[in-house]
Amino acid sequence: MKKYVYMFPEGNGKMRELLGGKGANLAEMTGLGMPVPQGFTITTEACTRYYEDGKTIYPDIQDQILLYLDQLEKITGKTLGDPEKPLLVSVRSGARASMPGRMDTILNLGMNDEICEAVAKLTNNPRFARDSYRRFIQMFSDVVMELPKSSFEQFIDQVKDKKGVKLDNELDADDMSELIVLFKDHYKKSLGEDFPQDPKKQLMEAVRAVFRSWDNPRANTYRRMNDIPHSWGTAVNVQSMVFGNMGETSGTGVAFTRNPATGEKKLYGEFLMNAQGEDVVAGIRTPQPISALADTMPEVYQQFVDISSRLEKHYGDMQDMEFTIENGKLYMLQTRNGKRTAQAALKVAVDLVDEGVCTKEQAVMKVEAKQLDALLHPTFDPAALKAATPITTGLPASPGAACGAVYFTADDAAKAHKTGIKAVLVRQETSPEDIDGMAVSEGIMTARGGMTSHAAVVARGMGTCCVAGVNGIKVSEEDKTLTFADGTVVHEGDIISLDGSTGNVYLGAIATQEAELTGDFGRFMGWADEIRTLHVRTNGDTPRDATQARKFGAEGIGLCRTEHMFFEPARIKAVREMIISDTLEQRKAALAKILPMQRGDFEAIYRAMGGLPVTIRLLDPPLHEFLPHEDDEIKELADEMGVSFDKLKGKVESLHEFNPMLGTRGCRLDVLYPEIAEMQTEAIVSAAINVWKEDGLHITPEIMVPLVSEVNELRFVKKVIKAKADELIEQSGLKMKYMVGTMIETPRAAVTAGDVAKEAEFFSFGTNDLTQMTYGFSRDDVGRILETYFDKKILESDPFARLDQNGVGRLIRFAVAEGKRTRPDIKLGICGEHGGDLSSVEFCHNVGLNYVSCSPFRVPIARLAAAQARVKELGLA
C-alpha cells in the first residue's frame, strides 16, 4: 500500500517534494534533537490524489491518518477526545515552496464542550481552556465551514465593551465562557447545525479543508505570482499542541536569524506573552522585540539564541522561525529559509560568502532573481526628503519609496491600478484576502501589526514598500478616510508618500531619484557573471535605452525596433508621405527624407553600446498603424499633406486588413516594397561606417528580417540587403562585416528552420508572436479568457509571460537542432518578453541559446537567472 503519512522522525529535510517545506523542516529539526512537539505529515501526494478523486479523501488515506494518530497518542500519552488525558493538535498546511499566509491553519483541534472543561480542571486554568476553545471554534468555522473569522469579531468587541476593556487578554474565564456560547450560537444560526463535538470528525474535516485551501483564490493568486504549479499540492502537518496562552510564563513568537529588511546579522523578531501564534502575525496586540525576552525569560532566550545559530549554520541560510513557550519550556514549531527584501537578500548572500558559510555558487541561489527588480527603481530624492516633514511614523516593515493615491480596500486598489492610477493601500490590518490589491499597490500602510505581521511579510516577499503599525491613525473603510493624530483627514484618491526604510509617512508626493547600483550589488552580480554562460542583451530602441541597459550589465542589443523611431512628430509626416505615395519615385523621395533620421538614430545607439553587438530589426508593423482612422483626423492630415480627403481616406481604407497581425507586415512589406529594406539597410550600414571612422568602434551590424515563414522570403530580402550593404562597404574602404538573420516567430519558420538557416546567419526567437501563432491566441485579447482558464485549471500561467515549454518550447528545441545541423556556428537568441522571465531564461540556457534579450530593467534579473541555471546544471546549489 502506498505510504501517505510519515511521523516526524521518519522524514528529513531532503523530502520537501513529498512532505512539503514545513514537514521536511520539522522532520529535520526532530532529527537534530531540537525541542519539536511530535506529530505526523500527510504528504503532497495525498493532496493531489484528493483532487484526482473528486475532492474526496478515500478510506485508505483516512485509515493511514488514524493509524498515525494512534502512534502520536502513544508517543504523547494523550488521546484525542479523552477527557482524562486529552490530546489537542494543530493542523497546518505546508507546500514545498513557502506560501506565508496564503493557506489555512487550525489550532486547538480536539476541543469540545467536555474536553474544554476537562482541560480547565487538569491545568487548573479555566481561562486558558476556554480561550483555547473559543479560538478553535473561530478558526474551524472560518477554515472548514467558510464562515468568516471576522464575523466573530463583533462578539469579542461586544464582550469587551460590556466589560470596559480594550485587549482580548483582559477578558477572564467567565468572559470566555460567554464568548463560547455566542460563537456556537452564531455557528448554528449561520450554518443550521451544531458545532461538531467528535474530535476525529473535526480532524478529517480539517485535513480536507487544508487540501481545499490549496485551491483557494489567494493561494492561486500567490502561485501565479511566484510560479508555483498547482500540481505540486500541499502537505498537511498534524502536530501535538503546545500552548503559549497558559499564563504569564507562556508565550509565542516569530524570529529571523538576521534582519529580513536589511540583512544585518542580528537576531530579529517579536513575541507576545500569554498568546497563541496567530496573535503575533494578526497584529491584534503589539508584540515585544525578541531582545526583550532576555529580560523576561533569560534561560529560554539563551536556549533560543543557541538553536537559532545552529539552524542557520545547518541550513546555510537566514532562517525564519516560529516558537512557543509553554510554562517556561521552549518548543520550536517551524523553521524555513526566511523571506527577505532585495537589499537584505544581497547582504545576506555576500556576508555568508565572507563568513565562509557558503560558496559563490550557493550564494547566487539565495537571491530570487525577480527580487532585483526592487533595487532598480527610483528611491526618494534626498533633498526632497530632507525638505519634507513626516505627518506620522510607523514601523519600517518593507523598504522602498512609494507614492500614490490612497485606497482603503484591496478591490478599490486593484480597480485603480487597472485605470493606470498608482495606488497606496491603507488598511486597519491586511489579511490574505487582500492579496490581489496588495500585489498591484505601490505601497501598503496599516494601522495595526508589527514587523512580522501579514502585511510586512507579504510586502517584503513582493518587494513592495510597507509601513506597518502606525499608531494614532484612524482608518475608516466605510467613510473612505484616513485620520491622523493631529486631526488631518485624507480621503480616497488623495496622495501620500511612504518611506519603507524609515517608517515615515508624508502628505503629498515626494520627488524620486534613480537607483544606484554599487557595493554588495556589484560584487554579487560579478559572481553571477563569472558563473553564467548565457549572454544577456537588451531590447532597446533609443540611445537612452542603450545607456540604461549597459548600466545594468547588458552585453548588446538583441532587438532594436526601427518602427518606434517613426512615431516622433518630426518623422511621422515623412513616413506618411511614403505610405500614400502612388509611384516608386514618390516613395523613394519620401524614404530619402527618413534615411538621415534613421542613420542618426543608429549612430547614437552604436555609440551608446560602445562596440557591443546590436541587432536591428527591419520595419515590422502593418503600414495602417502609421495612419489616422477617424474622419476628422484624416481630414486634418490631408490638409497638412496637401492631398484631398478622398484620396487619403481611400488609401487608409485600401490598407485596412481584417487581421493585420497576420497581414502585410514584417518581411512581406520588404517583398512588396523592396525600397524600404534598401533604405533601412543603408541607414544601418552607413551609420556603422560613420561610427567606425569617427570613433574607432569596429561595428558588425546584425540586420534582422522579421516574420519569415518561407525561406524564399528571406532569400529575396537578403538579396536586397546584400546589394546595398556590399556597395556601401566597398565605397567606404573598410573591411567591415555584417550579418543577416531572421526572427523565428511563426510555427512554419520553426519547423523549416533547417532550410531557413541556409540563408540566416542568426536566429532570434520572437516568442511573443510565436506564442500567439502557436496557441492561436490574440495577445491583446487573451486577458479576457485567462482568468477563467486559470480558475478551471486549463492553464497554470500566462503563456505570454512565461514560455510554454511543452508547445512553443518544443518548436524552439526543434528549430535550434535543425538550425545547428545546417549551420553549426549559427548564433541563437531570444528577444520576446520571455527573455526576462526566470523559468524561460533557464529553458534558454538548457536548449543551448547564446543569449537572451529583455527590457533594460530586467537585464540584472536575466543575468542572475542565467547564473542560477548554470549552478543547477552543475549541481552546485
Regions found by a protein language model. Give the residues of each.
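Nucleotide/phosphate-binding sheet-loop regions of phosphoryl- and nucleotidyl-transfer enzymes
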Residues: 1-388, 411-415, 421-424, 431-436, ...
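Short beta->alpha connector loops at strand-helix junctions that form conserved
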Residues: 40, 447-449, 468-471, 560, ...
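Conserved alpha/beta-domain cores
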Residues: 92, 517-519, 527-877
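Short alpha-helix capping/helix-loop boundary micro-motifs
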Residues: 310, 480-486
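Short, compositionally biased
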Residues: 356, 506-525
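Residues forming the flavin
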Residues: 462-464
